[in-house]
Amino acid sequence: MRRWGRRLRQLAGGVLDLPQDVVLEVPRITMIGHLQMYIENHRGVLHFSEKELRLLLTNGQLIVHGEQLVIRAILPEEVLLEGRIGGVKFLEKP
C-alpha cells in the first residue's frame, strides 16, 4: 500500500509539474561549499550541538556532522545551518 501511494504521488507530481521534494515529502538540501546548508521539508529538530544537527524527516532522520555549527535561522519546515560541515547522513525508518 505504501508503494502504491508513493507511485501515485510521483505520477501526480509529473502531471501537475510539481517538484519531487514536495510530492515525495523528502528534504531539499542546498549547500554552499562546506560552510552553509539550507534544509527544507524537515519535521523538527531532534538534537543540536556545535558538532551535530539531527532533524526529523517524514521517512526518518537527517544527521549533519561538523564543527562550530550554528543555526542562523529556523522556521517550521526550514533550517539555515552554518559552520564547517563535515558530513550528511540519512537514516530511514525501518
List the predicted regions and their residue ranges:
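N-terminal intrinsically disordered, cationic/polar leader segments
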Residues: 2-94
